[in-house]
């Protein structure tokens, strides 16, 4: 009898690798649910009896937002409804069958709104000029109308942590403002509450989750406007910092939640003109002649690298 020897090492290695991937994916899911849940609680985004209109574009962010919200709804201590909405703007090449098929298979209530805003923008905006302003206004108006028609009490958008930081830098670099994307706001028509449940979520986690879930991603056919080019450049800057300087992006995002108006220059946010010496010592008062100190410097070598980078 001939003996056949089988090397079991590759099989064992594959099994170990599979278990590792499964564990990492489980950790990722827990982190996404935790961060979305924390944002919802911190900003009171969703309340008892809400009907949340989840805007789904076909990109990884909106797919992930819908996915995580459905998971959270299943175990939430309150009741709320979800309806997924896609605005088909009739851009050339948009695969209109993808989202209805996916949402039907998912079993979620959904609505596809067909509006040819693409032709309107092309007709009104001269060739070579930016289309962002008009396109955005048209899209907003349509989605707010649909929210009214569906009886939605909240409109959920899929902007994440990196989008908020990109917007902060775009406003600072090109508009001279310290302004980002709020996690929750009242719409410009005064009738709707808009929420961003992914406010605490890093884009790199959404990329991994989309790969794991195999969402049917619809390629984004951007118009190539200057604003989008600038956003891409700022996004690459943030990714480069994230690669080279551990903790920098997290610290910047934390800074958006720790604003000190008295140490900026906006007189509408702090009464500099009315300041008077009271003669009473303040332990938290500014030490004007001292060099600012950063607690992080004494706590972590990585922070020192962040500041020096």
Swiss-Prot record:
GO BP: tRNA thio-modification
Signal sequence residues: none
Domain of life: Bacteria
Nucleotide-binding is among the record's keywords: yes
UniProt cofactor(s): Mg(2+); [4Fe-4S] cluster
Catalytic activity: cytidine(32) in tRNA + S-sulfanyl-L-cysteinyl-[cysteine desulfurase] + AH2 + ATP = 2-thiocytidine(32) in tRNA + L-cysteinyl-[cysteine desulfurase] + A + AMP + diphosphate + H(+)
Pfam families tied to this protein: ATP_bind_3 (PF01171)
Subcellular location: Cytoplasm
GO molecular function: 4 iron, 4 sulfur cluster binding; ATP binding; magnesium ion binding; sulfurtransferase activity; tRNA binding
Chain location of the short sequence motif PP-loop motif per the record: 57-62
Disulfide bonds: none
GO CC entries: cytoplasm
Keywords, alphabetical: 4Fe-4S, ATP-binding, Cytoplasm, Iron, Iron-sulfur, Magnesium, Metal-binding, Nucleotide-binding, RNA-binding, Transferase, tRNA processing, tRNA-binding
Pathway membership, UniProt: tRNA modification
Primary location group: cytoplasm
EC category: transferase
Cofactor note text: Binds 1 [4Fe-4S] cluster per subunit. The cluster is chelated by three Cys residues, the fourth Fe has a free coordination site that may bind a sulfur atom transferred from the persulfide of IscS.
Enzyme Commission number: 2.8.1.-
Function recorded in the entry: Catalyzes the ATP-dependent 2-thiolation of cytidine in position 32 of tRNA, to form 2-thiocytidine (s(2)C32). The sulfur atoms are provided by the cysteine/cysteine desulfurase (IscS) system.
Subunit structure: Homodimer.
Protein family: Belongs to the TtcA family.
Name of protein: tRNA-cytidine(32) 2-sulfurtransferase
Organism: Variovorax paradoxus (strain S110)
Gene designation per UniProt: ttcA
């Amino acid at each position: 009898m001939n003996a056949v020897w089988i090397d079991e090492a590759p099989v064992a290695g594959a099994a170990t690798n599979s278990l590792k991937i499964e564990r990492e994916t489980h950790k990722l899911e827990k982190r996404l649910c935790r961060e979305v849940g924390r944002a919802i609680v911190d900003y009171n985004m969703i309340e008892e009896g809400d009907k949340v209109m989840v805007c789904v574009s076909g990109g990884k962010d909106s797919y992930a937002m819908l996915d995580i919200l459905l998971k959270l709804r299943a175990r939430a201590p309150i009741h709320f409804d979800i309806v997924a909405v896609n605005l088909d703007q009739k851009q050339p090449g948009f695969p209109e069958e993808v989202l209805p098929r996916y949402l039907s298979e998912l079993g979620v209530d959904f609505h596809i709104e067909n509006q040819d805003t693409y032709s309107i923008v092309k007709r009104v905006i001269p060739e070579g000029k930016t289309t962002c302003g008009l396109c955005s206004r048209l899209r907003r108006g349509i989605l707010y109308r649909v929210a009214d028609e569906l009886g939605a009490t909240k409109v959920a958008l899929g902007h994440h942590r990196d989008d908020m930081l990109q917007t902060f830098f775009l406003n600072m670099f090109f508009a001279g403002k310290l302004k980002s994307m709020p996690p929750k706001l009242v719409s410009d028509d005064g009738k709707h509450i808009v929420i961003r449940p992914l406010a605490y979520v890093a884009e790199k986690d959404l990329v991994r989750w989309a790969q794991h879930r195999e969402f049917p991603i619809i390629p984004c056919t951007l118009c190539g406007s200057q604003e989008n080019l600038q956003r891409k450049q700022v996004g690459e800057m943030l990714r480069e910092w994230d690669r080279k300087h551990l903790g920098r992006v997290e610290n910047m995002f934390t800074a958006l939640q720790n604003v000190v108006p008295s140490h900026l220059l906006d007189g509408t946010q702090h009464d500099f003109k009315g300041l008077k010496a009271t003669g009473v010592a303040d332990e938290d008062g500014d030490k004007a002649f001292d060099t600012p100190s950063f607690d992080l410097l004494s706590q972590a070598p990585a922070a020192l690298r962040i500041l020096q980078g």
